[in-house]
């Protein structure tokens, strides 16, 4: 997906990972969807020319960061998007919370927006069942 995105939109995307996946299929799909929605939001709203995605795990945590050099995001813009029914960032947040993850929006001198998700590795021990599939 990332290679297709780079080729289609001409946005430089660097992807770094040590995450092997395969321990929890639903979690792996959730990570994919978070990255997919984030890249879609970056294309639609940020004007970024550069994106950096890092997905790494250690003994205790799996951490995903998605950073871009676009126009940035303020709390007011997030609240306005929610009121207008543009819920991309809230969909991402819900996916993170489904796996008891932490969610932060940050920025630094290089990147105007940094989405950070942090999950405890212990939550991967049990396969999350999507109740919507059953019903």
Residue map of PLM features:
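A short beta-strand-to-loop micro-motif at the C-terminal edge of the catalytic HATPase_c
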Residues: 56, 106-112, 120
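Glycine-rich nucleotide-binding loop
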Residues: 61, 72, 109-116
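ATP phosphate-binding glycine-rich loop and adjacent ATP-lid/helix-beta elements
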Residues: 78-109
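Conserved ATP-binding N-box helix of the HATPase_c
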Residues: 28-50
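Conserved short strand/loop->alpha-helix "switch" segment adjacent to the catalytic nucleotide/phosphoryl-transfer site
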Residues: 10-36
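Acidic ATP/Mg2+-coordinating residue in the GHKL
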Residues: 68
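Short beta-to-alpha transition helix within the HATPase_c
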Residues: 1-9
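Short beta-strand/loop element within the Bergerat-fold HATPase_c
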Residues: 50-60
């Amino acid at each position: 997906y990332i290679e297709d995105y780079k080729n289609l939109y001409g946005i430089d995307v660097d992807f770094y990972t040590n995450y092997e996946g395969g321990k929890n299929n639903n979690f792996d799909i959730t990570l994919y969807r978070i990255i997919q929605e984030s890249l879609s939001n970056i294309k639609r709203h940020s004007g970024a020319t550069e994106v950096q995605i890092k997905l790494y795990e250690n003994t205790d945590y799996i951490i995903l960061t998605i950073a871009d050099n676009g126009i940035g995001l303020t709390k007011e813009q997030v609240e306005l998007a929610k009121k207008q029914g543009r819920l991309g960032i809230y969909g991402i947040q819900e996916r993170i919370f489904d796996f008891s993850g932490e969610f932060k929006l940050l920025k630094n001198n290089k990147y105007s927006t940094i989405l950070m998700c942090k999950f405890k590795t212990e939550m991967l021990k049990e396969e999350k069942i999507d109740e919507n599939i059953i019903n």
